[in-house]
Regions:
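A conserved beta-strand-loop-helix scaffold within acyl/acetyltransferase catalytic domains
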Residues: 4-48, 53-64, 138-148, 162-163, ...
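Conserved acetyl-CoA-binding loop-helix of GNAT-fold acetyltransferases
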Residues: 81-93, 324-338
């Protein structure tokens, strides 16, 4: 068996039904990265007309030295150690000729499911693949706690067959209903509106202003990406707030009579809470009235979603922090799940941290995603296959590997 370059048709036919198929291992992703500092190759491990493994391999320079990166790992049967070993041996020979100094992989192999309450891990049958890769010469890198690596090590994935607003956390349900009451609307957007997403996410991650537009242009060629925006419908906001105010006013009048007849602390506190709610609704009506005749649509949140196989993945999302009280991020995620529920099996909410403690600086992000009741999966992590130890150790000692790959 030997390694050779595959043409587009060969690769797509092999990849589309593979167990580890993912959007990072697609021709679309190859084209995207080729516009943002990488070269790429599509390779296969073959014997005559049979392909046993394949990969999109990205190539880049660090300090004048070439390295390769295989996002989400090779498309190969990792449980077949003899196949992995043969492939790896040929891989080293193949890329040594191309002056590649090391190959980084982060396979999309789930090794455990984490209980969001107890944080206890239940390991899968894939866990021994760590030892398989190490025996085949791959160096297992330290597992990250937060978001230090290229891709998140822990992902939150919602099974859409289980998805129902009634199953969500109380806080999440309340935030979604608040967004609905405040007149939030959800729409499919176009690439020409990508400036909104760039604005919503500019403090979250540093990207070229053209990066997400390029993403959309390339992935939309085969309809494997969607762009969504959330705006405020102030007319709906007024109507909803008026209805809520009138309903609460009737409740408040009943509570007022109750306090007069039974002036207990509990009744007084309930009446005071109702007074606060009435004031909030009154302020909502005033705010909506003030903005009712704005000459433009006001977008306050957005997301890009990539589709591959039976999974839709929220690639990036963000919202205007001025509208925090509208809970637009909760409304956005809820509507995305509704949008895909009849077409896809899973929604990948993307990364959360391995450290789920309250003390973690990403606790708010974790709790936001956990409120949608996802399954929490831990992936196998990053491995390096060293081809030129001298150059690899040189880059390591100079801190250039950490600079290139550590995302914190």
């Amino acid at each position: 068996m030997y390694i050779r370059e595959l043409n587009a048709e060969e690769y797509e036919n092999f990849a589309k039904n593979h167990k580890y198929a993912n959007y990072h291992q697609t021709l679309n992703y190859a084209m995207l990265k080729s516009e943002h500092d990488y070269e790429y190759e599509i390779i296969g491990f073959c014997d005559d007309d049979t392909i046993y493994a394949a990969a999109l391999v990205l190539v880049k320079l660090i300090d004048g030295y070439l390295y390769a990166y295989v996002p989400e790992g090779f498309l190969i049967d990792y449980e077949n150690e003899s196949l992995v070993r043969l492939f790896t041996d040929e891989l080293i020979k193949y890329y040594k000729k191309e002056d590649i100094n090391f190959i980084k992989i982060n396979p999309s192999i789930i090794i455990s499911e984490i209980d969001p309450k107890t944080h206890i891990k239940t390991y899968t049958d894939n866990y021994p693949i760590i030892n398989t890769l190490e025996r085949c010469g791959y160096i297992k890198l330290n597992d990250n706690t937060n978001f230090e690596s290229i891709l998140p090590r822990v992902n939150a994935i919602v099974n859409l067959n289980e998805f129902n607003i009634n199953n969500l956390s109380k806080n999440t349900k309340n935030k979604i209903r608040k967004g609905i009451r405040k007149g939030l609307t959800f729409e499919v957007a176009e690439n020409s509106q990508m400036n909104y997403l760039n604005e919503f996410t500019k403090r979250k991650i540093k990207r070229s202003e053209f990066y997400y537009s390029d993403y959309y242009n390339i992935f939309s060629r085969n309809h494997s990406i969607d762009y969504f925006l959330v705006s405020v419908d102030y007319e709906k906001y007024i109507l909803n707030s008026q209805m809520a105010y009138e309903k609460e006013l009737k409740k408040n009048e009943r509570l007022n009579n109750k306090v007069k007849n039974i002036p207990k602390t509990r009744n007084i506190n309930t009446k005071m809470n109702s007074d606060k709610t009435l004031l909030a609704y009154k302020n909502d009506i005033a705010l909506a009235s003030k903005n009712l005749n704005k000459p433009f649509k006001e977008y306050i949140a957005g997301a890009l979603v990539v589709k591959n196989g039976d999974t839709a993945t929220i690639l990036i999302s963000g919202y205007d922090k001025k509208y925090y009280d509208f809970a637009p991020n909760y409304f956005l995620y809820f509507m995305i799940m509704n949008y895909y529920q009849n077409e896809y099996k899973y929604i990948n909410l993307n990364g959360i941290t391995a450290d789920l403690s309250k003390e973690n600086k990403y606790h708010g992000l974790n709790e936001f995603k956990l409120g949608f009741k996802p399954h929490i999966y831990e992936y196998i992590g990053e491995f390096d296959l060293v081809i030129n130890p001298h150059i690899y150790n040189k880059l390591l000692k100079k801190g250039l590997l950490e600079k290139e790959f550590n995302k914190n």
